[in-house]
Regions:
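Tryptophan-anchored aromatic micro-motifs
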Residues: 1-13, 27, 86-88
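Exposed beta-strand and adjacent loop surfaces of beta-rich binding modules
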Residues: 2-4, 37, 46, 99
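A structural detector for beta-sheet-dominated domains
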Residues: 8-10, 23, 50-52, 78-80, ...
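Short, solvent-exposed aromatic-acidic interface loops
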Residues: 12, 30-35, 52-57, 89-95, ...
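Short, flexible N-terminal segments of the mature chain
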Residues: 20-31
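Contiguous, well-ordered beta-strand patches that form the walls/edges
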Residues: 32-83
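Edge beta-strand at a domain terminus
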Residues: 42-44, 83-85, 90-123
Length: 123
């Protein structure tokens, strides 16, 4: 289950996209405006996740999907193939249904491993 995922998520009629790295029970990710930090456990095939989403970009054109600059999301779901499908809710929007589909990104698209030379990495 550990790996890098693209994430499509929504609440009510709003939706967004992010990336998320899952590793050893931790969830780290985000997008252009919000960081997503959390944890997960797997019990009897069910994934239980808790995520805090927090604004890192003060641009007012990026609206918070959860109605606030900081929100706590709780969700449960299952891994099916290369996707994790979650459903839950956020503390900032009681009663609203939150969903997320995480699709694992193919490691085959990564560049080959190697050493970084004296000049480091440059653009």
């Amino acid at each position: 289950m550990d790996g890098l995922y693209k994430v499509e998520y929504g609440v009510n009629d709003a939706f967004g996209r992010s990336i998320m790295c899952l590793h050893d029970g931790k969830m780290l990710g985000g997008n252009s405006a919000f960081a997503h930090l959390g944890s997960y456990v797997e019990r009897d095939g069910e994934i239980i996740a808790e995520v805090i989403t927090e604004r890192h970009n003060e641009d007012p054109h990026y609206k918070p999907l959860m109605g606030a600059d900081v929100a706590r999301i709780g969700a449960r779901g299952r891994l099916t193939g290369n996707q994790i499908r979650l459903q839950g809710g956020a503390d900032t929007m009681p009663g609203a249904g939150f969903w997320a589909n995480l699709t694992r990104l193919d490691d085959g698209a990564l560049p080959p491993r190697g050493t970084i030379g004296q000049g480091g990495i440059a653009n």
